[in-house]
Amino acid sequence: MRIIVSGGGTGGHIYPALALVESLLKHEPDSKVLYIGSFRGLEGSIVPKTGLDFKQLHVQGFSRSLSLTNFKTVNLFIKAVKKSKHIIHDFKPDIVLGTGGYVSGAVLYAAQRLRIPTVINEQNSIAGVTNKFLSRGADRIAISFPHAANQFPKDKVVLTGNPRGQQVFEKKGDFSLTEFDLDPKLPTVLIFGGSGGALKLNSAVVNFANRFSEQKKFQAIFVTGRKYFDSVSNQLADLKINSSNFVVLPYLDNMDDVLPKIDLLISRSGATTLAEITALGIPSILIPSPNVTANHQEKNARQLEERGAAEVILESDLSSAMLYHDLSELLSHKSKLESMAQAAKKLGHPDAADKLYKLLVQVINERKQETTK
């Protein structure tokens, strides 16, 4: 297969794309893959490390208010579409996959104009503006939440799940919590506010750190985010927190290794995180970010809450006392954790990347049949 993959801006668009590529190369090792990203997004630092062929476009998002920058945005989009057409013409893909972000809008729109088969992967329960715009010309839309189905043309929608779920589900390794000087036998909570950290969550955790460190029934890995690490460390030092059951880190580079070893996750509710924890069956306390388009993180989180897989605390309601009460209640009641874990697993798609790969093959074959009629 010759495929162009495009998705950018955040890890939530990039990692599902890379998970699909991993599945593709497992099934068809001789496939040719070209990844097209933007100059502004994280893909510029992530994708080249994978060894994939990588090209970049100049794009930017629209301002939600009337602004002269939107004229520049339109101009950049037109230029990006034109450049995408040249790239597509030279690469000659069998299909183009978009996983979200403004850059995928330009690439998929160009592919559709050139009558190249296109598939959209929508990771959230609330569809992004770019994916809604592209759905009319797409061959299929692969969704991760059933709730997203009614936002696209019905005959094009396929529930595959988020490819990232399979990648973390299949991760093999001999990692142990002893690497953090923790006891593998104790119930463990991972507190993670995302790659950038979450200020209010960090404050809540710091405020209950003393109580947490005094009990010895369970343990925590607290990931602050790099920009908050020094501040949090200083606050904990002032409180004289230095406990063997409370590990503080700026970031986790080996999240795939750590997730299977924990009993509870406290985190934001981005699509990639939810794909990971449902594939693995991890109970969670979710604190949706209020700073996202269309409040999609809360919508994502409610999908798990409704099925008994997670508890949801809105950031506006978050307090140190509430969070400590909820996590200690869950970690103290194994039967409740097991029930939530089973509910999470039922929502998971541990074969999502393979499902998406098969969908791509199906679309390519359908287009071939159409051209031979």
Swiss-Prot record:
Name this protein carries in UniProt: UDP-N-acetylglucosamine--N-acetylmuramyl-(pentapeptide) pyrophosphoryl-undecaprenol N-acetylglucosamine transferase
Main location, first listed in the record: membrane
Pfam families: Glyco_tran_28_C (PF04101), Glyco_transf_28 (PF03033)
Reaction equation(s) it catalyzes: Mur2Ac(oyl-L-Ala-gamma-D-Glu-L-Lys-D-Ala-D-Ala)-di-trans,octa-cis-undecaprenyl diphosphate + UDP-N-acetyl-alpha-D-glucosamine = beta-D-GlcNAc-(1->4)-Mur2Ac(oyl-L-Ala-gamma-D-Glu-L-Lys-D-Ala-D-Ala)-di-trans,octa-cis-undecaprenyl diphosphate + UDP + H(+)
Subcellular location: Cell membrane
Coiled-coil ranges from the UniProt annotation: none
Cellular component aspect of the GO annotation: plasma membrane
Key words, A-Z: Cell cycle, Cell division, Cell membrane, Cell shape, Cell wall biogenesis/degradation, Glycosyltransferase, Membrane, Peptidoglycan synthesis, Transferase
Residues that coordinate or bind UDP-N-acetyl-alpha-D-glucosamine: 10-12, 124, 195, 297
Enzyme Commission number(s) of this protein: 2.4.1.227
UniProt topology in membrane: Peripheral membrane protein
GN (gene name): murG
Enzyme class: transferase
Phylogenetic placement of the source organism: Bacteria, Bacillati, Bacillota, Bacilli, Lactobacillales
Protein family (similarity comment): Belongs to the glycosyltransferase 28 family. MurG subfamily.
